[in-house]
From Swiss-Prot:
Residues 122-180, 200-243, 270-297, 315-338, 366-385, 441-467, 483-508 are annotated as: Disordered. This is Fibroblast growth factor receptor substrate 2. Part of a complex containing FRS2, GRB2, GAB1, PIK3R1 and SOS1. Part of a complex containing GRB2 and CBL. Identified in a complex containing FGFR4, NCAM1, CDH2, PLCG1, FRS2, SRC, SHC1, GAP43 and CTTN. Binds RET. Binds ALK, FGFR1, CKS2, MAPK1/ERK2, MAPK3/ERK1 and SRC. The tyrosine-phosphorylated protein binds the SH2 domains of GRB2 and PTPN11. Interacts with NTRK1, NTRK2 and NTRK3 (phosphorylated upon ligand-binding). The gene is FRS2. Residues 122-131, 227-240 have a biased composition (Basic and acidic residues). It comes from Homo sapiens.
């Protein structure tokens, strides 16, 4: 064993050794850099070269590995002795080396999971991609830099003939030898999808796909050339997508809510123009004397939005949002003022919560205040006696039918609304009665004859006259005596030493 490590010659190691394999390190051009012996232990890969220095790769640091008929390659991580890189070795027993490494990884519960590098290929379809595990070192592939700064395919033209711990170019990307045909699963065409160990399931997912997203520029150009009028609808219905480009990944976002509103507004304006051209007599504009550009641009029928008016639901046409008027004006909407029309034309709010009304209550008399009782509004903000059908929110200029006014005025005349009544008045003191307990303090404190409290039946006078009973009597003589006693306490004249313990005067 020791002789093999010190003298790794071809003759010293048999060709059928269990865990030692004769390998030749090659570069990306297929040139041989040096021969050695690859040994697989329980924890790491060890490469012994002729100059007696060994290179170790721990199994936990291997990102992916693969094999060909006469080639074994793997990718190491940044924590390895050699750093990050892809290393390839020619070996006559490459398949045995791969199977043994995979068995060791499975026994040690080491899972190498790497997402495949998906690239576009114009010459070969997805169904022709072989499913054999292989490495990403395809011949002629352009070098790409990783986010951490290390090259994905290092160059080994200036590498020495033996591995070194300081140079990540100990191994090389897997490349075929001179004259070798690219017929093996590992030797695929340029820019081909690369699959590694434990990632064969990705190929099944890719085979199930039927189409590939086209770039955004192509889609927009085709949409403009074919159907320019249908472009807003296609943009509106488009979902966020992720497109894979040769230079990177492109994210295509869907339309924002503001864009959707603008596109819907354009649709409604177009629909209004069609209705005006079809039947112009029905959509008559009202003249209010205001020079409003918004009112002149599009018909007012397609812009009116009313929420919670009289609690009635407005019929809506198919394909249009709730609450929008698209048909001709009916008898109910003809009473609406134009000023309210101009305000609601610019405000298109939906799902607005209905606010409780605020009314100014008239001053109640004493009898009405007693008859109405306490004011307790209900949970929904309306009094029980009020009809919630009559709730006008954000419709200050809307004219309500006269029948509604009659009903509302009759209700307000019968029962004053009590919702949000800010008439805070002090209740009358005439009906109040104060019960108090009178205690005889002059009597003796004899336990045999306890004094029983007396509860008078007559109410207490509203204006008390004997206010002197509420004040305490001050004993002047006792106050002067306590003051003299306080002045007689010893004071510090500055001669005594003060410490932390006797710095304050202690009580006598």
């Amino acid at each position: 064993m020791g002789s093999c490590c010190s003298c790794p010659d071809k003759d010293t190691v048999p060709d059928n050794h269990r865990n030692k394999f004769k390998v030749i390190n090659v570069d990306d051009d297929g040139n041989e850099l040096g021969s050695g012996i690859m040994e697989l232990t329980d924890t790491e890969l060890i490469l012994y070269t002729r100059k007696r220095d060994s290179v170790k790769w721990h199994y936990l640091c291997l990102r992916r590995y693969g094999y060909d008929s006469n080639l074994f390659s793997f990718e190491s991580g940044r924590r390895c002795q050699t750093g990050q890189g892809i290393f390839a070795f020619k070996c006559a027993r490459a398949e045995e080396l791969f199977n043994m490494l995979q068995e060791i990884m499975q026994n040690n519960s080491i899972n190498v999971v790497e997402e495949p590098v998906v690239e576009r290929n114009n010459h070969q379809t997805e169904l022709e991609v072989p499913r054999t595990p292989r490495t990403p070192t395809t011949p002629g592939f352009a070098a790409q830099n990783l986010p951490n700064g290390y090259p994905r395919y290092p160059s080994f033209g200036d590498a020495s003939s033996h591995p070194s711990s300081r140079h990540p170019s100990v191994g090389s990307a897997r490349l075929p030898s001179v004259g070798e045909e690219s017929t093996h699963p590992l030797l695929v065409a340029e820019e081909q999808v690369h699959t590694y160990v434990n990632t064969t399931g990705v190929q099944e997912e890719r085979k199930n796909r039927t189409s590939v997203h086209v770039p955004l520029e192509a889609r927009v150009s085709n949409a403009e050339s074919s159907t320019p009028k249908e472009e807003p609808s296609s943009i509106e219905d488009r979902d966020p997508q992720i497109l894979l480009e040769p230079e990177g990944v492109k994210f295509v976002l869907g339309p924002t809510p503001v864009q959707k509103q603008l596109m819907e507004k354009e649709k409604l304006e177009q629909l209004g123009r069609d209705q005006v051209s079809g039947s112009g007599a029905n959509n008559t504009e009202w003249d209010t004397g205001y020079d409003s550009d918004e009112r002149r641009d599009a018909p007012s029928v397609n812009k009116l939005v009313y929420e919670n008016i009289n609690g009635l639901s407005i019929p809506s046409a198919s394909g249009v949002r709730r609450g929008r008027l698209t048909s001709t004006s009916t008898s109910d909407t003809q009473n609406i003022n134009n000023s309210a029309q101009r305000r609601t034309a610019l405000l298109n709010y939906e799902n607005l919560p209905s606010l409780p009304p605020v009314w100014e209550a008239r001053k109640l008399s004493r009898d009405e205040d007693d008859n109405l009782g306490p004011k307790t509004p209900s949970l929904n903000g309306y009094h029980n006696n009020l009809d919630p059908m009559h709730n006008y929110v954000n419709t200050e200029n809307v004219t309500v039918p006269a029948s509604a006014h009659k009903i509302e005025y009759s209700r307000r005349r019968d029962c004053t609304p009590t919702v949000f009544n800010f008439d805070i008045r002090r209740p009358s003191l005439e009906h109040r009665q104060l019960n108090y307990i009178q205690v005889d303090l002059e009597g003796g404190s004899d336990s045999d004859n306890p004094q029983t409290p007396k509860t008078p039946t007559t109410p207490l006078p509203q204006t008390p006259t004997r206010r002197t009973e509420l004040y305490a009597v001050i004993d002047i003589e006792r106050t002067a005596a306590m003051s003299n006693l306080q002045k007689a306490l010893p004071r510090d004249d500055g001669t005594s030493r003060k410490t932390r313990h006797n710095s304050t005067d202690l009580p006598m």
